[in-house]
């Protein structure tokens, strides 16, 4: 998946591995998304990225953006090159 964030930044999600990308997200956070009623994580991520983030910053592991969707906060962590490292609910 390749998309542009509202600020124009190019972001993309690859299959990845246990540390980053879709495999990391599914392995580490699938249950969190299921608890929110979300089954198709890549499609949901694509929808989330169309919204304007409520917060952006740089944490100890790199850049992130927080989004509010249906009353739930989600974090997208990405590399400086736009590679999506992780995605998960933070509420």
Where are each of the predicted segments found?
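Ribonuclease/tRNase effector modules and their secretory precursors
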Residues: 1-91
């Amino acid at each position: 998946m390749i998309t542009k964030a509202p600020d124009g930044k190019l972001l993309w999600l690859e299959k990845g591995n246990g540390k980053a990308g879709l495999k990391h997200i599914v392995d580490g956070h699938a249950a969190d998304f299921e608890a929110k009623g979300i089954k198709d994580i890549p499609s949901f991520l694509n929808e989330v990225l169309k919204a304007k983030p409520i917060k952006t910053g740089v944490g100890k592991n790199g850049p992130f953006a927080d989004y509010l969707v249906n009353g739930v906060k989600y974090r997208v962590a990405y590399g400086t090159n736009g590679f999506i490292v992780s995605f998960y609910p933070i509420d």
